[in-house]
């Protein structure tokens, strides 16, 4: 870019050369800002032109076009001059020789901080080792952290992505599909959560065009077929509403529009219908002067046309979490077709279009999110999740389920409103109130009637949770709860229960082992000797070590080896009273010792099979042992596992949390581990609860194919309530592949739950 010339050092730029022609003028904020600093915007324009000089975009246009367009979008959002300047400079640190120090000197620390924040969202410290999905997940985590620090960073990023999507034609098809899918998964839902509806709509339609081009252009062609006829219909209907408002002495601006392409596509897919069966592709909007006049206009509309029962929504009384307010009603319109009508005030319309930007833009200093502002409760929830969920992919999946799905609004018995993902159950509602309420939930009343815990709540339901001190979460709840909060709390409780059982089992095994050497377990515990042994085995406290013994990660012999005097160990070995010579363990408590009874199992296995097993599991480092897998839990490589000697059958392998395994005599437990040297596949059965719609089974099987997973058996049946239960036995390489597969299926439209059985 600069050739052999160094970039400009920190200096004063002469803004007199600023081009004032309309097509090159950077966005002005004069029309909406009471006292804008236009000089800094002009200065940023000149600087951006200088440092980007000679750079071209894929389209062949000068690179400067991009920052100008980004700044223009930020101007449409009516943001402050610092945001506009950031839009002009957002690529300077990443793509030129400009530095943060230079930007600080020229434009101040606020702008430099914003530009640096946008730059960091695009950088990965270990990009070479990350998959595209992992990059996307990590990038989203960064966005949430940046958003909590200064919301303008995300608004600039949204503007940047919007212009990039507008010019995506010049990318390769592979990049088009990847960028569009990411936009559909993350940026469009994020714009919706921030309340910026026009960006959300544009990003969805642009993404749809590149993710599913055939469907996009086919649907667009159908919409264009009767476009002029529909435009005339919109004009006539608007005139009719205006005249009726005037007759009543009501003021209001009336407009009509086509619903955007992607929203129509989603309705076709979710309802399993054809385009010809979609009757509400047109919507009308009335902008009234006050909230009370909105309800007056609603009454007039319902007098003119019959409302469709169950299709009225009052978002004025109960705003959406993204601050959206409006009255929604669906009526049987002039041509006997369904038509949606939205009624709101001009202030509500402004918030619907600008969203979060409408609430902070002229406040002094940083646009930092207030911890006390209820409008940002969802963002505070995101911050908590990103701290709790260390895996970026798990964090992203959590957000997609809990925050980026459609919502239902339900009431507590006191009249408080709770927003939950569509498909949420009373158990999700209980955990949304408090973890203790969820843990003790025994039932629920919806609108005064007892309902099953699996009941899917609807808009306007009043939900009362019934609790009992004796109740505790059931593993079965995981098959139907929707929210990640409920899933985490249920898993946490079950894990704690398993820990307590393993702790008790570990104490019994340790006590039994120490008694062989006439040692008292409790005395060693009180004396501190047990603590020393735990630390020596790589644990912080005694309980962690005992839990590991209960799980089978550490053997009782490894403990006795550290507590029993050597002469006693030698005597026991010489006398044949000790079954094994405990070996030294590695740090972390995962040993590789020869276990009690292993030689007998090995001899038995050799007689039975006479060769190495092909199970993918090692028994105490020995390969040639007959191994079976518990059908109750069907472990796959990657699952924590435990082995149990089964007379006449070698060793049976279970997952460590399997209830059958926990109930097995601990004396029969042996140390097992997955053999990482080979590629071993295991059958797993998945139960997928779905809507009963055409094409959904094909979507699921296509997912198996894309993930490289073979189906060995399948059983699909309709349940008679517009649902279907689909059971698949699939061949899985490891736990990571299984988890990824289940999460992908869960994201399919019409899938309610995916369960491993």
Swiss-Prot record:
Pfam (any one): TGS
GO cellular component terms given for this protein: plasma membrane
Pathway entry: Purine metabolism; ppGpp biosynthesis; ppGpp from GTP: step 1/2
InterPro entries (UniProt xref): ACT-like_dom_sf, ACT_dom, Beta-grasp_dom_sf, HD/PDEase_dom, HD_domain, NT_sf, RelA/Spo_fam, RelA/SpoT_AH_RIS
Location of the HD domain: 63-165
Disulfide bond positions: none
PROSITE patterns referenced in this protein's UniProt entry, alphabetically: ACT, HD, TGS
Domain ACT: 685-757
Residue ranges of every copy of the TGS domain listed in the record: 406-467
Enzyme nomenclature, EC number: 2.7.6.5
GO BP annotation list: guanosine tetraphosphate biosynthetic process; response to starvation
The keyword Oxidoreductase is annotated on this UniProt entry: no
Keyword terms of this UniProt record: ATP-binding, GTP-binding, Kinase, Nucleotide-binding, Transferase
Catalytic reaction list: GTP + ATP = guanosine 3'-diphosphate 5'-triphosphate + AMP
Single GO MF annotation: ATP binding
SMART domains assigned to the protein according to its UniProt record, in alphabetical order: HDc, RelA_SpoT
Keyword rRNA-binding: no
Annotated region described as Disordered, given as residue ranges: 13-33, 571-592
Function: In eubacteria ppGpp (guanosine 3'-diphosphate 5'-diphosphate) is a mediator of the stringent response that coordinates a variety of cellular activities in response to changes in nutritional abundance. This enzyme catalyzes the formation of pppGpp which is then hydrolyzed to form ppGpp.
Family as reported in the entry's similarity comment: Belongs to the RelA/SpoT family.
Protein name: GTP pyrophosphokinase
Organism: Myxococcus xanthus
The gene coding this protein: relA
């Amino acid at each position: 870019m600069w050739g052999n010339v160094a970039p400009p050092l920190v200096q004063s730029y002469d803004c007199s050369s600023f081009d004032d022609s309309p097509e090159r003028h950077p966005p002005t904020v004069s029309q909406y800002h009471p006292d804008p600093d236009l000089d800094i915007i002009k200065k940023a324009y000149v600087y951006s032109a200088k440092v980007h000089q000679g750079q071209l975009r894929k389209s062949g246009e000068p690179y400067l076009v991009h920052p100008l367009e980004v700044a223009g979008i930020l101007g449409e959002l009516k943001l402050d001059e610092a945001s506009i300047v950031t839009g002009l400079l957002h690529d300077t640190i990443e793509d030129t020789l400009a530095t943060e120090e230079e930007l600080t000197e020229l434009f101040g620390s606020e702008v430099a901080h914003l530009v640096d924040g946008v730059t960091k969202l695009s950088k990965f410290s270990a990009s070479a080792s990350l998959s595209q999905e992992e990059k996307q997940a990590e990038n989203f985590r960064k966005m949430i952290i940046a958003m909590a620090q200064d919301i303008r960073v995300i608004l600039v990023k949204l503007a940047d992505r919007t212009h990039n999507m507008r010019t995506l034609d010049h990318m390769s098809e592979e990049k088009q599909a990847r960028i569009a899918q990411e936009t559909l998964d993350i940026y469009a839902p994020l714009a919706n959560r921030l309340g910026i509806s026009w960006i959300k709509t544009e990003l969805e339609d642009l993404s749809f065009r590149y993710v599913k081009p055939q469907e996009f252009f086919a649907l667009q062609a159908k919409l264009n077929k009767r476009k002029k006829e529909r435009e005339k219909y919109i004009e006539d209907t608007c005139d009719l509403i205006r005249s009726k408002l005037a007759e009543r002495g009501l003021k209001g601006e009336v407009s009509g529009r086509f619903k955007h392409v992607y929203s129509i596509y989603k309705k076709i897919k979710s309802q399993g219908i054809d385009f010809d069966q979609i009757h509400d592709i047109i919507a009308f909007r009335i902008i009234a002067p006050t909230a009370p006049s909105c309800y007056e206009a609603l009454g007039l509309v319902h007098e003119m046309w019959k409302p469709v029962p169950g299709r009225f929504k009052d978002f004025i009384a109960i705003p959406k979490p993204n601050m959206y307010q409006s009255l929604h009603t669906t009526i049987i319109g002039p041509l006997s077709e369904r038509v949606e009508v939205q009624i709101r005030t001009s202030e509500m319309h402004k918030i619907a279009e600008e969203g979060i930007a409408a609430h902070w833009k002229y406040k002094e200093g940083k646009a930092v999110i207030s911890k006390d502002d209820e409008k940002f409760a969802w963002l505070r929830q995101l911050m908590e999740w990103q701290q709790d969920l260390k895996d970026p992919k798990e964090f992203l999946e959590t957000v997609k389920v809990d925050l980026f799905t459609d919502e239902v609004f339900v009431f507590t018995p006191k009249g408080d409103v709770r927003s939950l993902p569509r498909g949420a159950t009373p158990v999700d509602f209980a955990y949304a109130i408090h973890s203790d309420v969820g843990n003790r939930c025994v039932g629920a009343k919806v609108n005064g009637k007892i309902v099953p815990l699996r009941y899917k709540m609807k808009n306007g339901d009043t939900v009362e949770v019934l609790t009992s001190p004796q109740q505790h979460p059931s593993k079965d709840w995981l098959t139907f709860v929707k929210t990640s909060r409920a899933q985490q709390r249920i898993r946490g409780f079950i894990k704690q229960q398993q820990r307590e059982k393993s702790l008790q089992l570990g104490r019994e095994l340790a006590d039994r082992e120490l008694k062989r050497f006439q040692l008292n377990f409790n005395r060693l515990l009180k004396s501190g000797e047990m603590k020393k042994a735990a630390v020596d085995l790589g644990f912080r406290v005694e309980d962690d070590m005992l839990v590991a013994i209960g799980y089978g990660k550490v053997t009782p012999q490894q403990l006795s080896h550290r507590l029993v005097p050597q002469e006693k160990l030698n005597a026991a070995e010489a006398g044949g009273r000790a079954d094994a010579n405990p070996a030294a363990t590695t740090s972390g408590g995962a040993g590789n010792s020869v276990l009690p009874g292993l030689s007998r199992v090995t001899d038995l296995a050799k007689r039975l099979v006479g060769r190495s097993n092909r199970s993918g599991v090692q028994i105490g480092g020995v390969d040639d042992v007959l191994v079976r897998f518990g059908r109750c839990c069907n472990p796959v490589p990657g699952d924590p596992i435990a082995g149990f000697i089964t007379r006449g059958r070698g060793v049976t392998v279970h997952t460590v949390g399997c209830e059958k395994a926990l109930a097995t005599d601990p004396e029969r437990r042996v140390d097992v581990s997955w053999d990482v040297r080979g590629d071993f596949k295991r059958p797993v059965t998945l139960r997928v609860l779905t809507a009963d719609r055409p094409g959904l089974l094909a979507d699921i099987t296509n997912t198996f194919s894309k993930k490289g997973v073979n189906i060995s058996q399948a059983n699909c049946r309709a349940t008679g309530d517009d649902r279907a239960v689909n059971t698949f036995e699939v061949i899985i390489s490891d736990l990571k592949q299984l988890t990824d597969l289940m999460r992908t299926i869960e994201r399919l439209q019409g899938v309610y739950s995916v369960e491993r059985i």
